[in-house]
């Protein structure tokens, strides 16, 4: 007996839902869909079949009264959305903060968590108070406990003993060093004070042999009368060595030139009157130190005093002839008798110092030349003072600003500042050699103008 045909419902795009009867009861889904697509004139490959929302195999038998849905297939694209979906899912899974979410009752989880934490904190309030009170009691107990001191430490006692011994040794060494410095300072101070004492003694011993500067023709006879003996002695010992040269500057109408090379800048020249058979009277500046040096040199060379005098006279006459033609006027320097005495005393002191120098050192004595360029320079050279004769800064201040400036310039030091500053600067180099002076006190050399 033939099986009854099955009646099924088919639903698809474009025709809605309709009932279709199959040819036989054992008809497959593939045959049923293929015949329907032919009737609708659509390709069967563009659909897939679902039954009750699930895909079915096309080889299954058609069920009576079932509803079959034809779902059109979508044309697949290039793809690439899968990677984006995976990245988004990873970000969602990474976060653990769900407080912004809401529970089933609509409350945010953040508020719910805060209420739970507040209830827990209120519940533990009593425990916290008890713990705080316990800590306070423990702190009081620690403060009330007496410290355990140990006063029998052998190491500490040993350290104290060693420190006491080292302190005693250090004090003794310091006292010895201080006493040695005091003794050396007293010795050096005594040595510095010997020079003024010696100069005062020499001043009293040689008061009869005083010499003065020749101020002009009007005072020539007075100078000859008062210093005849000393002039005769000095004229015999006139210097003629290679290290000493003489030039006669023109003074007044006589036309005699007077200049000399000195062993040191601080020594003073003294005038000696010498008669050599001519009506003109020659005046030659001589220093005690130069006389000693020249006598030794003449003794070594075997020259006689007469030969030395004749050579000196010849050189002086030649110089007079040359200077008489030029006729350059030179201002005379007014000098008092008291100033001449002080200068002569300083000359004797300097001469004695040079005389005490060894013979081999006398040959190395520096020779300075008097400059006659300007009257101001002549004043500076002639009035150079002996700093050893001053014992305080106040005495140097009595010299005045200009005199202190000249002395500082002669030493190559800075000459600016007030009267007190100049006097203090000059007093600080008293008795010091040029190498011992602080380099900061020297004046800076003048720089040429840039072209």
Swiss-Prot record:
Provide the propeptide boundaries. Answer: 1-77
Q: Which residues carry this modification: Phosphoserine?
A: 266, 278, 326
Where are the compositionally biased (Basic and acidic residues) regions?
302-329, 340-362
Annotated tissue distribution: Ubiquitously expressed; enriched in brain, lung and liver.
Q: Where is this region: Disordered?
A: 182-208, 222-362
Name the coiled-coil region(s).
109-149
Q: Name one Pfam family in it.
A: SDE2
Any notes on this protein's domains? The PIP-box (PCNA interacting peptide) motif mediates both the interaction with PCNA and cleavage of the SDE2 precursor by a deubiquitinating enzyme.
Write down what this protein is called.
Splicing regulator SDE2
User: According to the entry, what is the taxonomic lineage of the organism?
Assistant: Eukaryota, Metazoa, Chordata, Craniata, Vertebrata
